[in-house]
From Swiss-Prot:
PROSITE patterns per UniProt: RIBOSOMAL_S19
GO cellular component: chloroplast; mitochondrial small ribosomal subunit
GO biological process: ribosomal small subunit assembly; translation
Organism ancestry: Eukaryota, Viridiplantae, Streptophyta, Embryophyta, Tracheophyta
A Pfam family annotated for this UniProt entry: Ribosomal_S19
Gene: rps19
Keyword Transmembrane applies: no
Function: Protein S19 forms a complex with S13 that binds strongly to the 16S ribosomal RNA.
Family: Belongs to the universal ribosomal protein uS19 family.
Organism, scientific name: Phaseolus vulgaris (Kidney bean)
Name this protein carries in UniProt: Small ribosomal subunit protein uS19c
Amino acid sequence: MTRSLKKNPFVANHLLRKINKLNTKAEKDIILTWSRASTIIPTMIGHTIAIHNGKEHLPIYITDRMVGHKLGEFSPTLNFRGHAKNDNRSRR
């Protein structure tokens, strides 16, 4: 289900504070965050945000096409290694 348009998009307060601080200083530091549920808003464009995937932080450069999506969409948590090899020799 999508979020109601009457409500504002969810952005974690600490993340919003960090972005506003960097915007006033006009700096482009990497921002570490664990908040995968935060929505990307236009003030984040141009920043690099390192999003936690459960193991490490993946740096993602925010572009204008990402606005409206969640941060967690851009850092995959699972890596598929492939199906088990069908080894007929082990069956005999």
